[in-house]
């Protein structure tokens, strides 16, 4: 049974307006896309989504898979009468976006994969993190997580930004966070990359310690015709760190996708 997802729909709704779905990182809520949603909703129907167990979405106890998270998104889109859509996903959201592009090619018009991976390290690391959070809450990992989200220079210059991001992680229910760690532990899409047939943008942050540029290069090399971009200076969540540049990159990608016939 899919989880009920909190979400926000912005922008015009019409048969001619393209739909853009935004999927965020582990430990985030949909506000990590606020800057992009404000701009892109001028000419897209933007659906910004909180994964299960994130933001105010339903918490489903126990482990889940990336396929489960994708099923949640599809159920949400069905409930609001969205058939075909563009999708942008960052980190965990990028894994979900990959799954959607592989398994729902008739629905996914294009995909933007930001600071993500076809495989996120070894399962044991995610199992350890899930255990730490189930035992100590997201406070057990919040500082380490936020240190990876933005560059050290930006963190030093804007302590209020660090504080806000830390509150975002702390606001994530422990079971929701841990369950999505379980999903990442089981994720390995490397053999499926060649099945992604829609226009694809692959974007890396030059200082991202979680999914460094080589992880994104692996995706770009595996997806036929993918565009590969490295942005600088940026760590793991460039939607917040350099929002205007990410918005511009997404707009160029969406415009190019439309020009190839992806409505």
How should these model regions be labeled?
Residues 6-59:
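Conserved HGGG/HGGXW glycine-rich cap/lid loop of the alpha/beta-hydrolase fold
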Residues 68-85:
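Conserved acidic catalytic loop of the alpha/beta-hydrolase fold
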Residues 89, 93, 97:
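Gly/Ala-rich beta-loop-alpha elbow adjacent to hydrolase catalytic centers
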Residues 98-103, 107-142:
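Flexible "cap/lid" loop of the alpha/beta hydrolase fold
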Residues 121-124, 136-194:
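Conserved alpha/beta-hydrolase catalytic His-Asp/Glu region
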Residues 196, 202-204:
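Short beta-strand/loop motif that positions the catalytic acidic residue
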Residues 206-211:
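Acidic catalytic loop of the alpha/beta-hydrolase fold
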Residues 226-263:
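Catalytic active-site module of serine/aspartate enzymes centered on a nucleophile-bearing elbow/loop
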């Amino acid at each position: 049974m899919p989880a009920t997802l909190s979400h926000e729909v912005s922008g015009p709704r019409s048969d001619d307006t393209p739909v853009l779905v935004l999927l965020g990182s582990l430990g985030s809520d949909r506000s990590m896309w606020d800057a992009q949603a404000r701009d892109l909703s001028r000419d897209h129907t933007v659906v910004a989504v909180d994964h299960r167990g994130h933001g105010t979405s339903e918490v489903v106890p126990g482990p889940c898979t990336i396929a489960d998270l994708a099923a949640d998104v599809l159920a949400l889109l069905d409930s609001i009468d969205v058939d075909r859509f563009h999708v942008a996903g960052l980190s965990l959201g990028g894994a979900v976006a990959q799954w959607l592009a592989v398994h729902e090619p008739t629905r996914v018009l294009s995909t933007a994969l930001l600071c993500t991976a076809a495989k996120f390290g070894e399962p044991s690391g995610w199992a350890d993190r899930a255990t730490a959070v189930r035992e100590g809450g997201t406070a057990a990992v919040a500082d380490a997580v936020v240190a990876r989200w933005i560059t050290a220079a930006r963190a030093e210059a804007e302590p209020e930004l660090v504080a806000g991001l830390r509150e975002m992680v702390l606001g994530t229910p422990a079971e929701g966070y841990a369950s999505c760690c379980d999903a990442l532990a089981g994720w390995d899409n490397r053999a499926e990359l060649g099945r992604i047939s829609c226009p694809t943008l692959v974007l890396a942050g030059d200082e991202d310690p979680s999914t460094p540029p080589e992880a994104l290069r692996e995706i770009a090399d595996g997806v036929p015709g993918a565009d590969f971009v490295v942005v600088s200076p940026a760590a793991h969540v460039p939607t917040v760190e350099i929002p205007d540049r990410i918005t511009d990159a997404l707009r160029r990608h969406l415009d190019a996708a439309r020009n190839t016939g992806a409505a």
